[in-house]
From Swiss-Prot:
Family membership noted in the UniProt record: Belongs to the complex I 49 kDa subunit family.
Matching Gene3D superfamilies: Cytochrome-c3 Hydrogenase, chain B (1.10.645.10)
Function: NDH-1 shuttles electrons from NADH, via FMN and iron-sulfur (Fe-S) centers, to quinones in the respiratory chain. The immediate electron acceptor for the enzyme in this species is believed to be ubiquinone. Couples the redox reaction to proton translocation (for every two electrons transferred, four hydrogen ions are translocated across the cytoplasmic membrane), and thus conserves the redox energy in a proton gradient.
Record-level Gene Ontology MF annotations: NAD binding; NADH:ubiquinone reductase (non-electrogenic) activity; quinone binding
Main location: membrane
Subunit description: NDH-1 is composed of 14 different subunits. Subunits NuoB, C, D, E, F, and G constitute the peripheral sector of the complex.
Name listed for the protein in its UniProt record: NADH-quinone oxidoreductase subunit D 1
Record keywords, A-Z: Cell membrane, Membrane, NAD, Quinone, Translocase, Transport, Ubiquinone
Membrane-protein topology: Peripheral membrane protein
Subcellular location field: Cell membrane
């Protein structure tokens, strides 16, 4: 009888397929994975402690550097938490601008994630460049509105930094003309490539019960068949006024996770159409006038208490928990990072698969190590 011996190998922390400084201790029997332990912390930057020694508004640019693909979404979550803590209202126009920016961010994120999946499976560069092409157009819009392409620091407590420039909406409409064909093109790349199908179908399956037990959220959870989306479960901003669907999968494998992301881009496109149509009729300005000078002439001092706010970021449920002692700095500042939580069931998803599948399964979770390690 053939006897085999288990072997422990390390993948990362310096590896081209780990999407950052991430280490996996993999126990293998031949090429088959027996166990996998994720090791975090190589990119820890003390984000929460920095926020606790900074004023509330000084923490806003730090959030850009959590998930640096989704700076607008990070800004939004912190803004909601502080507004809840301090009882700050947001003008209707600012709410619609916020939703517009976050949904553009969702398209940007998912386009990059699908491109990276194909890249990781050996479709070197070309499909990734399709996603990056659309991403660049969205970054141009962010630069037009905020002055920055990635670290936007655009949101403010009570609104946004400034109103949209006159040329923003015309350029956005021009971008949106090409998005439906881009979504179809990406879906065709997934559905009509036999090698890709064999590498993704029934690979990295995450059953819904396991997903819930790990508190997984976002596209990873919805791919497992659970229609949970914070925009519907606990509507914030103006999402309760907008019409969109929550796509779900049935198997919870790599294939489902990326089909979900493509369909979510289509739903973000629907939301953008509604926002553009309603934006001219919105009331109020880009920021609550009472908050216009916060950080310039005076500091924000919320009353003692605590608040938790969450949003549906492109990666999943992003939450900020704040405790105020009445000073200009938070007594406690805690981030619920979806990349970190979604990464915890990686061992369950990889067990029984081949070593070559680890890269594909990890890529399908869609993580950014800046958010994982904080």
């Amino acid at each position: 009888m053939l006897q085999t011996q288990e072997l422990q190998i390390n993948i990362g922390p310096q590896h081209p397929s780990t999407h950052g400084v991430f280490r996996m201790i993999v126990t293998v029997d031949g090429e088959t994975i027996v166990d996998l332990k994720p090791v975090f912390g190589y990119l820890h930057r003390n984000h929460e402690q920095l926020a606790e020694v900074s004023t509330y508004i000084q923490s806003m640019p730090y959030t850009d550097r959590l998930d640096y693909f989704n700076s607008m979404a990070n800004n939004h979550a912190l803004a909601l938490a502080v507004e809840k803590l301090a009882g700050i209202s947001v003008p209707q126009r600012a709410e619609y601008i916020r939703v517009l920016m976050v949904e553009l961010t969702r398209i940007l994120n998912h386009a990059s994630a699908v491109g990276f999946l194909l890249n990781d499976m050996g479709a070197w560069q070309t499909p990734l460049m399709f996603g990056m092409r659309e991403r660049e157009k969205i970054l141009d819009l962010f630069e037009m509105a905020s002055g920055a392409r990635m670290m936007c620091n655009y949101f403010r407590f009570g609104g946004v930094w400034r109103d949209l420039p006159p040329e923003f909406i015309p350029q956005l409409k021009e971008l949106m003309q090409g998005l439906p064909s881009f979504f179809d093109e990406f879906e065709r790349l997934l559905k009509e490539n036999e090698i890709l199908l064999s590498r993704t179908i029934n690979v990295g399956v995450l059953p819904k019960e396991v997903a819930v037990s790990y508190s997984v959220t976002g596209p990873v959870l919805r791919a497992s068949g659970i229609p949970y989306d914070v925009r519907r479960a606990e509507p914030y901003s103006v999402y309760d006024e907008l019409d969109f669907d929550i796509p779900i999968g049935s198997v919870g494998d790599v294939y489902d996770r990326f089909l979900i992301r493509i369909e979510e881009m289509r739903q973000s496109y629907r939301i953008l159409q509604q926002v553009i149509e309603r934006l001219p009729d919105t009331t109020g300005g880009h920021i609550n006038p009472a908050m216009a000078n916060i950080g310039k002439q005076k500091a924000l001092r919320p009353p003692p208490g605590d608040a938790y706010a969450r949003i549906e970021s492109p990666k999943g449920e992003l939450g900020f928990y704040l405790v105020s002692d009445g000073s200009e700095r938070p007594y406690r500042y805690k981030v619920r990072a979806p990349s970190f939580i979604n990464l915890t069931p990686l061992g369950d998803m990889c067990r029984g698969h081949k070593v070559a599948d680890v890269v594909v399964i990890l890529g399908s979770i869609d993580i950014v190590m800046g958010e994982v390690d904080k």
